[in-house]
């Protein structure tokens, strides 16, 4: 809540621009945020035919909305400056590009624009009521609830939940993008988004220590980088306004990345981020019957696997790169050592492709105990995917700055891709790693018995 207060104080004046040919998202000024705004909801329809020019619709005039097709509602959250969300147009275009559908932008900027956050949050039920009135008319015209999809950002996630609750959870899907935490944390299910609000509820939590909601709210809850500080976002207040909103907005950009086919972000079901980082959560993907869940638009492809769980809910964790498309590529590094004594330490791995590109991963795990003839499997994350690896470099460190330097005697090292399980496993045998000294070698294909 403290960061929210600072966030509001950093807002600056936004000019109004109303001279437009096509209806556009309501643009208000910071003055409007200071004096407050009454609630007014506009529904803006985009279709395959009208991708850039919205049509204003309402419960008495559905316009060119095709009730036989999927309808996706985009619901924004708190707007302390009055400006439109910077991501709204890109999200509309990206959704229409992947599937022919109706996209309805729920513009409640008059109501969400205020410097007093509780005033905005108090209007969420009213917005949900207006949306229900509109959907009721869609149903009269022949639409089906399971063909309705709601994407809610921040406060918008709870609005989507309230709409779903009014239909007893029969909506097809609700996606919550960093659902708002302040004034909702600790509230009972009927006062926030929860799994009973739709047939499938997926959530991305990207700012759980400030503006977002920490606990699980859906059938599957994704926690990028543990749901806390996001790579590429400022770490101190000296980053300006971006410090306050970057982590919160990252949920939207990760969702957008899933629509743009640059890469497929996968996550790993797990009890905690710590267990995920330590490589304990790979019950999906390479070598497994169940694929790993995909983050974003295609998350619902995993719902059939959730039905086998009791309850049908899970948390999933993943890491991201600092820049678009945010994908990290996961590998397992399996090491069998033959030291007489146990060696505890960390491994850094660097890969060089045949094209000369290099990518490095500090395998960020707790100190591993390398015991004689015992295999240790380490999860490594790279921000570049190398199709053909020409050279591998390993560095062993105990993390100690004083005392003797140790050796790690490696009987076998195996590198295997989780993202591409069909790729051949790469091995190296009989290797000695001197502490804090990088050792490079050309890998060979593992023998068939070790695949």
From Swiss-Prot:
Main subcellular localization, coarse class?
Answer: secreted
* Single GO term (MF): phospholipase activity
Lineage, top ranks: Eukaryota, Metazoa, Chordata, Craniata, Vertebrata
Protein name (Swiss-Prot/TrEMBL): Lipase member H
Instruction: Look up and give the organism this protein is from.
Output: Mus musculus (Mouse)
Q: Which InterPro entries match?
A: AB_hydrolase_fold, Lipase, Lipase_LIPH, Lipase_N, TAG_lipase
Topological category with respect to the lipid bilayer: Peripheral membrane protein
Pfam families noted in UniProt? Lipase
Primary enzyme class: hydrolase
EC? 3.1.1.-
Q: What is its biological role?
A: Hydrolyzes specifically phosphatidic acid (PA) to produce 2-acyl lysophosphatidic acid (LPA; a potent bioactive lipid mediator) and fatty acid. Does not hydrolyze other phospholipids, like phosphatidylserine (PS), phosphatidylcholine (PC) and phosphatidylethanolamine (PE) or triacylglycerol (TG).
Catalytic positions are 154 (nucleophile), 178 (charge relay system), 248 (charge relay system)
* Glycosylated position list: 66
Instruction: Tell me its family.
Output: Belongs to the AB hydrolase superfamily. Lipase family.
* Alphabetical GO biological process terms: lipid catabolic process
Q: Which CDD domains match?
A: Pancreat_lipase_like
Tissue specificity, per the record, is: Expressed in placenta and colon. Weakly expressed in small intestine.
Q: Which domain of life is it from?
A: Eukaryota
GO CC field:
extracellular region; extracellular space; plasma membrane
Positions of disulphide bridges: 233-246, 270-281, 284-292, 427-446
Q: Where in the cell is it found?
A: Secreted; Cell membrane
Catalytic reactions on record: 1-hexadecanoyl-2-(9Z-octadecenoyl)-sn-glycero-3-phosphate + H2O = 2-(9Z-octadecenoyl)-sn-glycero-3-phosphate + hexadecanoate + H(+)
Q: Tell me, how does this one assemble? A: Interacts with TTMP/C3orf52.
């Amino acid at each position: 809540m403290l960061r929210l207060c600072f966030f509001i104080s950093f807002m600056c004046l936004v000019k109004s621009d109303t001279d437009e040919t096509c209806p556009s998202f309501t643009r208000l000024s910071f003055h409007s945020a200071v004096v407050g705004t009454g609630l007014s909801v506009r529904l803006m329809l985009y279709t395959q035919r009208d991708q850039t020019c919205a049509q204003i619709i309402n419960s008495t005039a559905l316009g060119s909305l095709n009730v036989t097709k999927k309808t996706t509602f985009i619901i924004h959250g708190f707007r302390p400056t009055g400006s439109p969300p910077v991501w709204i147009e890109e999200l509309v275009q990206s959704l229409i590009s992947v599937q022919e559908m109706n996209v309805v932008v729920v513009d409640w900027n008059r109501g969400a624009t205020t410097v007093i956050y509780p005033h905005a949050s108090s209007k969420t039920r009213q917005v949900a009521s207006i949306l229900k009135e509109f959907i009721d008319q869609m149903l009269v015209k022949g639409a089906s609830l399971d063909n309705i999809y709601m994407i809610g950002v921040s406060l918008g996630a709870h609005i989507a939940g309230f709409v779903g609750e009014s239909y007893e959870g029969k909506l097809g899907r609700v996606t919550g993008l960093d659902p708002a935490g302040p004034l909702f944390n600790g509230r009972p299910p009927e006062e926030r988004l929860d799994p009973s609000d739709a047939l499938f509820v997926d959530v991305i939590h990207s700012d759980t220590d400030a503006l977002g909601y920490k606990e699980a709210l859906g059938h599957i809850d994704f926690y990028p980088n543990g749901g806390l500080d996001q790579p590429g976002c400022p770490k101190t207040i000296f980053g300006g306004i971006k410090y306050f909103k970057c982590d919160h907005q990252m949920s939207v950009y990760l969702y957008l990345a899933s629509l743009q086919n640059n890469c497929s972000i996968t996550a790993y079901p797990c009890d905690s981020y710590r267990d995920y980082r330590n490589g304990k959560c790979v019950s999906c993907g390479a070598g497994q019957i169940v694929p790993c869940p995909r983050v974003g638009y295609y998350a619902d492809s995993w719902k059939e696997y959730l039905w086998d769980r009791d309850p049908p809910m899970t948390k999933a964790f993943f890491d991201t790169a600092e820049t678009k498309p945010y994908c990290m590529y996961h590998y397992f590094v399996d090491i069998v050592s033959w030291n007489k004594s146990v060696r505890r330490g960390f491994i850094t791995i660097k890969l060089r492709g045949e094209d000369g590109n290099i990518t490095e991963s500090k395998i960020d795990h707790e100190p591993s105990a390398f015991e004689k003839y015992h295999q240790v499997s380490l999860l490594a994350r790279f921000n570049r995917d190398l199709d053909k690896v020409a050279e591998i470099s390993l560095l062993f460190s105990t993390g100690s700055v004083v005392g003797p330097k140790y050796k790690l005697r490696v009987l076998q090292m195996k590198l295997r891709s989780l993202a591409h399980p069909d790729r051949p496993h790469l091995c190296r045998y009989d290797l000695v790693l001197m502490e804090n000294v990088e050792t490079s070698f050309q890998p060979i294909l593992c023998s068939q018995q070790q695949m």
